[in-house]
Structures are given as structure tokens and as C-alpha cells.
């Protein structure tokens, strides 16, 4: 394995993350050194908050252009409160955020054998040249890897019928009724299943860093790039296995030292 140590940064505003279970999962799976830290955004140079705020995006149909943040926006970053459930979500360019974070990793920890995995509530998005718009993303791979808990909830789509029913009536009452009807079929905020699903994304981050291969096209694989919540819950909670091809590359990785 190229990686000799994984440093994973928790997101303290998301209490569903069972960081100790995740740590154990990583140690048991990869038999490598794992260190858990409370948050990437604690004990870091104050400059970072201005830089992070400048990666905000406001227009979904335009490629990234650097935002000049207001004092209030910088203050919001400093506080790192969970705003993911607000109506007005703050969106960030995932690759720009990744670049920013990488600059704040101490030099002695910038080592290709040390993989940094940052869990965050920030909603990361990437601009897609094929349809010329931003899409929410749960995982921004490479080193550091960013995994967005809000992205896990927002990026894979809910059932089509859910949106159709909502289209007719947006009232709070109707929304609650529909949420009840489809309960369990997709991840919600404060969903206790989030932590286990996170393990799958962490696996994807590690495998991507080790092999350079992004995602899998096979729905029976934990590396599957789920477009629908239903697929996500199937591949990460029910099936929980690699396809035969990735089972083999996983074995190879853990047997190299
Ligand atoms: Zn696969």
C-alpha cells in the first residue's frame, strides 16, 4: 500500500458520524496507522477562513470565478456552524476548496504516504463541462480527500415520484407528508445510517488514491458511483461488497507493503 498513515478529520457539527467506529473500520480493513482529529478547521491559521469563503459559488450555470467574501461570510466560516439544513444552502467549488485546504496542511504532513481525509458539512459541487453546470458531489478525491456529509444527502437523487409529488404542492404540510411516505428510501439530515454510508465513501477515497481509478460502473460494488439514493443505500448498507474486479485490486493493495 502506498499509504502508510491515514489522518481523518471529523466534522463536529454532524453528531451522526461515529468517528470511533470509522477509525476501527479503517484499522481492521487496511491494517494501517490511523489518526483521528476533531476538525480540519480547528487550530489552523485564521487566513484559511477568508480563502474558504472565496470558494463559494453563486451561479450554477457559470464556471468558477473567485468570490471576494464579505466579513460576514468569513465570520460564518470561523464559526463553522451547521448551515447545511437551511433553505439557503452555501455551495462551494469542490476542487477550489480542495486546493485551499491542501495549502494549510503542515509541510511535514504533506507526504504522499499520508492520506488526509476531511469530513465536512460544506456542500461541495463540481462544474460539469458536458452540461455546463455545477452538480453537488459527495467526494472530492486525491490527497487531501474531501467527503461532504451534505453532499451524501443531496447529491444522489431521491425517487422520481418524490419530486413529482412535491411539484404539485410545496407547502410545509405536504412536504412533511411526502417525507413520511418515502421515509427510509433516502438519507435525511440526522439520519443514523449516515456513518455507515460514510465508510463506503472513505473506501472510495482510499481506493482512488491508491489506484487512480475513479468509481465503478457495477451496482454490486461498494465503489459504485450512486446517482440515486436507492442505489447508494443498496451498495453501502445492503450489499457492502466489492465487485470481483475491485475485490482483487483491494487484495493486491493490502498485500503490498
Ligand atoms: Zn467495482
Each language-model region and where it sits:
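N-terminal low-structure segments adjacent to metalloprotease catalytic domains
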Residues: 1-137, 250-257
Amino acid at each position: 500500500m502506498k499509504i502508510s498513515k491515514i489522518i481523518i478529520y471529523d466534522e463536529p457539527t454532524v453528531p451522526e458520524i461515529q468517528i470511533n467506529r470509522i477509525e476501527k473500520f479503517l484499522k481492521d480493513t487496511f491494517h494501517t496507522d490511523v489518526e483521528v482529529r476533531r476538525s480540519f478547521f480547528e487550530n489552523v491559521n485564521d487566513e484559511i477562513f477568508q480563502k474558504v469563503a472565496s470558494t463559494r459559488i453563486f451561479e450554477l450555470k457559470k464556471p468558477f470565478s473567485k468570490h471576494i467574501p464579505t466579513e460576514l461570510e468569513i465570520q460564518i466560516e470561523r464559526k463553522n456552524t451547521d448551515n447545511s439544513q437551511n433553505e439557503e444552502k452555501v455551495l462551494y467549488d469542490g476542487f477550489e476548496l480542495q486546493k485551499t485546504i491542501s495549502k494549510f496542511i503542515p509541510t511535514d504532513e504533506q507526504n504522499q504516504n499520508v492520506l488526509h481525509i476531511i469530513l465536512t458539512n460544506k456542500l461541495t459541487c463540481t462544474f460539469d463541462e458536458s452540461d455546463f453546470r455545477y452538480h453537488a458531489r459527495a467526494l472530492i478525491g486525491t490527497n487531501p480527500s474531501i467527503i461532504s456529509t451534505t453532499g451524501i444527502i443531496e447529491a444522489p437523487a431521491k425517487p422520481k415520484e418524490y419530486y413529482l409529488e412535491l411539484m404539485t404542492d410545496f407547502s410545509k404540510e405536504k412536504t412533511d407528508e411526502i417525507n413520511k411516505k418515502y421515509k427510509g428510501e433516502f438519507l435525511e439530515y440526522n439520519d443514523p445510517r449516515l456513518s455507515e454510508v460514510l465508510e463506503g465513501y472513505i473506501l472510495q477515497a482510499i481506493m482512488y488514491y491508491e489506484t487512480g481509478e475513479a468509481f465503478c460502473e457495477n451496482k454490486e460494488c461498494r465503489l459504485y458511483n450512486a446517482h440515486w439514493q436507492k442505489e447508494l443505500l443498496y451498495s453501502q448498507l445492503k450489499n457492502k461488497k466489492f465487485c470481483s474486479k475491485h475485490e482483487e485490486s483491494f487484495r493486491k493493495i493490502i498485500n503490498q507493503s
